[in-house]
Amino acid sequence: MAIITRPSNIKRAPLTRPKLNVNPLYDMQNGRMLLGMDGRWYLNGGLAQLNGFGGRGNTWKSTTQRTFHLKAHGRYCRNRGFGENMDSEFSVDPYRSVQLMQNFWEEETFDLMGELENTEGSYNVTDNSEQTGDHWWDCLHGDLNKRAEAKKADKCATPFRDYEGGLIHMLPIWHYDLDSASQLSMASTIKQTEKGTAGSAEQQTIWMRDAGAKAQMITQMAYDLPRGGAFLSMTAHLDDSIKLDTYAPSTKKLAGLKGDLKFKGVPGRQFTFLPSSCYVATAEGNMLDSAKMPEYGISERDAMKGDTDLKIVRYEQLRGKGGPTGIVSDFIYSQQEGMLEHLGCFYYLHKILGGYGMTIKGNSLGFTLDLYPEVYFTRNTIRGLLKTDRKFARAVEITAMMGYERFMWHAEPELYKMEPAVLHKLVKEKGYDWNDILENTIYWWHFNDDFNSINKHTVTHRTLIDMAMGLHEAVYLASYPGKSNGTSS
């Protein structure tokens, strides 16, 4: 009898599971660059199938999660798919979500109110008054199991490669914004709490059962979401744990949790260990300078002393399966407008990287970007420019992603540590038009058959470096040098 040289049961997991790009720096922290079949580099980072966001009150965790999911919907559910916000705290205002999208570019936004008003729309808001958390999950659990049986013909092509050198296909995206898991009510818990007396021993047992039900639910999520082609993020509250024994030492499951902070209303082990990433807000404050003026005013004329519209929140990644654990991220928010993605990129360049990719005039009185040197700006004009000048915002975005790879991706080839000023010079020397690049490209990947509705080419900073070095010819760009003499189309 011949010796068996290989096991009889070998089933390969996908070569990669595409993530949803939702924010330049968040995506870089949670991903890696992958070379596509078309010779372009694509960033596989961002929202994974299961994600967690935690923090105390007023740390913008709900806004962060909602912004990411609205971005995901606009980018990946343009022609298919479904998104839902499960509001367990009865605090969601659809008009606020519309306001959060005012800083999105045209190709990544969508008619949220129109989708909500349409009973067959691609976006929905539900809450605990309409259905309990266990009923909501049980229905989704069943749907995901059915979706897992889909054939390749039902899926959409991505730019990512599979084992055989073909394209990875995905089901139309379903995504869910659960805010919050802490307050998500389970049917059995509701019935039992109605009968009991507040604070009784019986009530304490009920809440232990509630935690057990949520632990089972999150465990199922980690299995069902990848199989069913869905993405889910959930928020949880952090608070100080109460010690019954004041002399007992602190026991922390993860090193990033300071003091005796503890997740409330969720099973800590499942919430922190099963998601691909778990971000926790550790600090929050106003963005005011030493003179109590806004660090970044809306305009030179409108800057007002003591204006606290701008907030900065520092997040720490407690769990990072797609990136380093313990890394911190500073996100910037306007209390009126929501997350300011590109202002956060500039803050990263200016304050964290010490002015990487820019020329600083005087004592930080003004700046020019190496990738867009034509525009001079100050701290009080940058917010307006980021809203009105797409080329400026794109230059900030590219520079921030270059800076992140330069200083954080230590194991990558030295070629991709190129300085922005060198990139600008070499790409221009190759005959490309930087105005075309900044105006008509995006960093995020999209489904291959969505190009006509997006009408922007995916060109990451890595692809730009390959263009600069003559390793990639961007024949798809209007400014491709060969098009002027008819050699390429």
Positions of predicted regions on the chain:
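Helical mechanochemical/support elements of P-loop NTPase systems and associated helical scaffolds
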Residues: K61-T64, D93, T132, W136, ...
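Active-site/pore-lining binding-face segments in mid-to-C-terminal subdomains
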Residues: I312-G357, K361-F377, T381-L386
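The Walker A/P-loop phosphate-binding site
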Residues: M1-N118
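Conserved catalytic network of the ASCE P-loop NTPase/AAA+ motor domain
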Residues: L43-G45, G74-N79, R147-A150, G166-M170, ...
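Phosphate-binding/switch region of NTP-binding enzymes
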Residues: I206-G344
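Terminal-proximal interaction/regulatory segments of ATP-powered molecular machines
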Residues: I360-S489
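Intrinsically disordered, low-complexity domain-flanking/linker segments in eukaryotic proteins
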Residues: Y26-Y42, A148-G166, S250-G259
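Conserved inter-motif catalytic segment of the P-loop NTP-binding fold
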Residues: G83-S200
